[in-house]
Each structure stands twice: as structure tokens, then as C-alpha cells.
Amino acid sequence: MQSLLDGHHHQLPSLLQQHHNGHHLLDQHQQHQHQLPPQATTTSESDGRAPRDELEMSKSGGSDNLESGGGGGGGGSGDDQDPNQRPRKKRYHRHTQHQIQELEAFFKECPHPDDKQRKELSRELGLEPLQVKFWFQNKRTQMKTQHERHENNALRAENEKLRAENMRYKEALANASCPNCGGPAAIGEMSFDEHHLRLENARLRDEIDRISAIAAKYVGKPAAAVSAAYPPLPPSNRSPLDHMGIPGAGADVFGADFDKPLVIELAVAAMEELVRMAQLGEPLWAPALGGEALGEEEYARTFPRGLGPKSPELRSEASRETAVVIMNHVSLVEMLMDVGQWTALFSSIVSRAATLEVLSTGVAGNHNGALQLMSAEFQMPSPLVPTRETQFLRYCKQHPDGTWAVVDVSLDGLRAGAGGGCQPAAARGHRRRPSGCLIQEMPNGYSKVTWVEHVEADDQMVHNLYKPVVNSGMAFGARRWVATLERQCERLASAMASNVASSGDAGVITTSEGRRSMLKLAERMVASFCGGVTASTTHQWTTLSGSGAEDVRVMTRKSVDDPGRPPGIVLNAATSFWLPVPPSRVFDFLRDDSTRSEWDILSNGGVVQEMAHIANGRDHGNAVSLLRVNNANSNQSNMLILQECCTDATGSYVIYAPVDVVAMNVVLNGGDPDYVALLPSGFAILPDGPDGGGGSLLTVAFQILVDSVPTAKLSLGSVATVNSLIACTVERIKAAITGDNGVAPPCPR
């Protein structure tokens, strides 16, 4: 203030006295704030930021002028006054109505006048420049306070609306009941207070952050401007399930009375159970032969409500497995959430899958929060193990630590009028409790996968020969899922290799395009073989005969307008039996080219030559080959054999199909493999128990074209011929592997 006085020494003494009185007012401001009326004009140290004391005095725009009282306005500096002298009485000068109107009009045009504009106003209105300056400061403070109050009221009303909506959801979930039996709907082991209040707290924290951001960034702006400048929270700051609401989603499958909050609660509860199941150790999981076993009593204590009561008609299966796979975590999540890629990745386990409804697409750019209703059919490569069909929710979420989780859970008890009900799982024979995997990013493009399978299934139709395998989890458990995933990830890495020479290839493959086409053709061959063994409904097989362990199950299918299969009537014969030798020995025998003539009718006693070889992983048993049979007495010189061999801890496969030479040349040159017609045959080899040290369970399956006319009638002679062929092959394999010196029966030509 002293510098200001020095810069204006040429002004009149009266002005100097007023400046001095203003300075004295600041000295006394803190002591007499409670005495000031709401319309006092005060001084400030800065031009845009009024002190907090001035906020309390600016309610009416600052239209009064406060000066020192007493006689004629004379007096010296505050430092020259007697400290014992009683402070003079203050007096206030209210601005005239004309002055206020002029100041208000100028404020609308320019709320921040500069020094020149303030001096002009002071001359026009008969005020001091400092009075004009402080009036504008207080006016801006007043406007800021009003806008703050308006915005806070709006946000408070919005917050109350969210609380009311939350209470409605709470009441709906608390009173949820099964529409068929009227009983309570069990939607997870978490109570509402454990989970929904947690969601409410998270949402309220978001609202607090939002209000704070507005107050810090947009204070002083009109409410409309704030709304336009501060859009709704971006997807990354919202719950992933907030993206639900795709037009038409859920209407067809769930019905018109589809309860979206209940489905959300089911998915969230399943996700939390999966994460805990994957992370907890003993006593929930205990070491067992071939892996880990779930403690049922501890599970009941850890998840007291579970996801509905267990059905007494279904047997519980639970398993957990962990592995590091050669696939990027983002790519793995993408494959799990795409039904086509998921089916191809696990073609030996999933014979059919479909996405029925997409309830949430998740956050843009990834699958965080994606929620969809799916159906699937799971298979075991044997006619003695029935397939398992189910419908389930699949929910994907990225957790704060970066870990991805994908969980499946059946919809039992939630769906009415769409094949649902209180116990639809018992009718279908399969129910998925929270099952899925946690995916953690690892260096160099690898991912750590922890897989949990927890299902209830009806195993009454499983043949006694396969019950030890099914009960141990090697048939449908986490160990098989993870082993298949490891093997398939290595296969995909091999398919993406750009250097043909360094990838273990040999023979006629010269380009990476031809290599990928050949691998794609082999992939389709394996999927067709597995679907034929189990009589999957996807592949439209009709069972003609076969029920016992020694029986051959014969199925038929008509192929029309399918470029991937020859037109006509196709017979599929499959049988399973036990061999008293380890699976590795059976696998090595069946994939050995030198012993192929001992069992393969296609070789017809000729010499088998490998023309191309593609290594599919670290295990030398995982490979795709192109074989030629050299037989001087055969007229099939134009026939090649495409073969894929694969093995892992839970089983092995040797699958092959005759292919035309011309069509195969197109594939080797990078052509479309979908137009190559093939009928696969082959073997599935499984250990007969979880220890893997006993015998083997071998499944043999042939697909044979018996008539090229699709409308022709199937003759009994064709069925008898196929039965004889598979019986002959089984006897030859038994004789060769077990060392039986007996003469194998001749196979039909």
C-alpha cells in the first residue's frame, strides 16, 4: 500500500487521507469482521482473488463504502497514533442507486476491468479507483458463491436420486424369489450388505471425486456451462456392467420380465467366488492324486450360500490347475470371449457353442465388463461318455492389479419361461458353478493361467470303464482345459512362425502361407473327428446301434452342399476299449510310419513316406504330417494322407484323412483349405486313471463314404462292412501292441 501512495503523491491530500483510512481498515479487519454489514467495500491484496473475509461481506455486490469515522478525516499514520487511544468509530458510505446500476451494467460487459477502465468509472461515478476495484472483486466473489451453491444443490439432488435408486435395487434383490417354486432365489454367497453396500460406497466415492473436480475446475461458471464442460464419467471410471442396455439384448432369451439387476448380481457374485477359489489354498484345496481336491465342508463354510442349493441328483466335480502359456494375455482374453475362437481353441472339449445374448460389450477397446449368455456342449473323445449341454453366463473383468478373469456360471433359478426353472440343471444333467480362469501378464508375451472347474453333473450314463477318468477330473476338469490350452498355444505360435526353415518343417512346404493353410485344414479335421466320436448334435449324426463297452456305435449323416465334406451318405463307426499298456506306448505305435501297415487299411501293405512335416510345439509328438503311400499294387497313386498327432498330460490323438493330390497342392500354395473335402478317422488315447501308470483307454473311429448320392437308402450291408472294418482294426492293434502272436483277422477291402 505504501508503494501505491508513493506512486500517487501528486494527488490531493483528501485522496491520500482516504487511502490511509483504507489501510487502517485492513489492519482492523480481522478484529471487527463480525461488525461489518454484508454490503461493505473492502481492500484486497490481489486483483482476482478476494480474501475469505470478503466472501462473507459480498452477499449484495459490495455497494457500501467503509471509512474511518471522526471529525474531518484528518489524522496520521496508524504507527503515529497512541496505542492506548480508543479506535475511532467506523462509518459506511452506501453507493447511490445510479452508481450501482452503472457498475452492474459495466460488470455484465467486462467483469475484469483494467486500471484505465477503473479510473474512467471512478471519474464518471465520483468514486475512488480503489472503491471501484473492490466493488468488482466483491461482485465476482458474490457470483462465484452463487454458482457454487447452485451446482452443489444440483449435485446433491442427483446424489439423492442415486441413493433412492440403490434402495429400490436393494429391496428388489432382498425380495427376489423363484417364479416357479416361490422360494428365495440364491444369488451368491455374499449378502447384500457385503456386496451391494460395497458397490454403493464405490459409487458415492466416484460422486465425491466428481464434485471435487467440478469445484476445483469449474467454479464460477454457469451451471449450463459446467454440465457441458464436464461430461459423464468415462467408461474407465464406471462399473463395467454400466454398459448394459444393448437394444433388444435379453428380450428373447430371458423374457419380457427379465430382471437385469438379478443377472448382474449373479455375474458379480460368480466373479468374486472364482477369484477366491483361484487364490485360496488349504484348507479349501488339499493335495490329491493328480492335482488338488476341493474340501466340500470348507467350501460350504467359505461360501455359505453358494449359488443355490446343490442338487442331490448331480455329482460335484471340482479341480484347479495353473500353467504358463505362450500367448499374450490380451489375445487370450479375446479368444475366450469370442465364441468361434473359443470353440476352435478347445475343439477336443467343446463340440458346439453359441452366444445367445450379448448383455454387455464391456469397455470400448477391450472386454472389461463384457457379459453374455452362452450355450455349449462339452465332449469326451469316447462313445461311452455322453456329452454335457448347458447354458451359462460368461463375465469378463479386469481387476485393479491388471489380472483378467473370465467366469462362467449357470443361470439356474434365474430364468423362467426360457427352459429355466428351479432345477433345470438336473434335467439337463449339467450345471456350471463359478468356473473359469485368472490370466496374469508375464514377460515376453507369456501369460500365467489359473483355471478352476466346478460343476455338478449326472454321471449315471458314463460307462464304468471311463468313470475313474471322469471322476478324477481328467475328462472335464481344469487339468484337461489347461493341458489343451498349453498345447494349442504352442500350435498357434507355430502357425504364426514366418521362417519356414527354422520351424521344424520338412518336405514340400515352401511358404508360410502354405504352412498356415495346411495347419488350418488339419484343425478342421481334428474338430470333425472329435464331433463324430461323441455323436455331437452339431455334426448332425444319427445313432444306429451300439450301447455296450464292446459294441461299435454306428452313426450316419447325409452330406449336401458342404464343400468341406464329400457329398453323399457317411457312416461313422466308433468304439472304445482298454489296453494293458501305457498311453505313451500306444501313441508311439500308432504314429510310427514303419508300423502303419500293421493296422491301416489305407496303406494296404505299402511303404508310407512323409512328404511334409510341421512341428507344433516342444513335444516331438505334436506335429502335422503329409503322407504318401507307395504301393505298386494300388491304383490310389493320387491319394495323400493328412495326419495330425498331438499329446499332453491328459490324452493323445492320432487323426488322419485321405486327401486329393490336386486339392492338397492348392493348400500347399496357400489356397483356401475350407474347400478340401475330407472324412477323418483316427484314435483317441487316454490314461485309465489319474496316476497315469496303468493301462490305456483307446477309442477308434472311422468316417466312411458309403454312397455318393445323398438321397440313397442306407443298406444293411454297408453297416456290416463298417462294423467289420473297425472290429478288424481293433484286433490288429491289440495283437501288435500286446504281443499276441495270434493271427489277426483280414480286414474288408
Swiss-Prot record:
Biased segments, Basic residues type: 86-97
Pfam families according to UniProt: Homeodomain, START
Chain spans, region Disordered: 26-98
Cited function: Probable transcription factor.
Feature: compositional bias, Basic and acidic residues: 46-57
DNA-binding region per Swiss-Prot/TrEMBL record: 88-147
Source species, domain of life: Eukaryota
UniProt subcellular location: Nucleus
Amino acid composition bias (Gly residues), ranges on this chain: 68-78
Assigned protein family: Belongs to the HD-ZIP homeobox family. Class IV subfamily.
Any one cellular-component term (Gene Ontology): nucleus
Name of the protein described by the UniProt record: Homeobox-leucine zipper protein ROC7
Family annotation (InterPro entries): GLABRA2/ANL2/PDF2/ATML1-like, HD, Homeobox_CS, Homeodomain-like_sf, START-like_dom_sf, START_lipid-bd_dom
GO molecular function: DNA binding; DNA-binding transcription factor activity, RNA polymerase II-specific; lipid binding
Coiled coil: 137-218
Swiss-Prot/TrEMBL keywords: Coiled coil, DNA-binding, Homeobox, Nucleus, Transcription, Transcription regulation
Residue ranges occupied by any START domain in the UniProt entry: 256-494
Organism: Oryza sativa subsp. indica
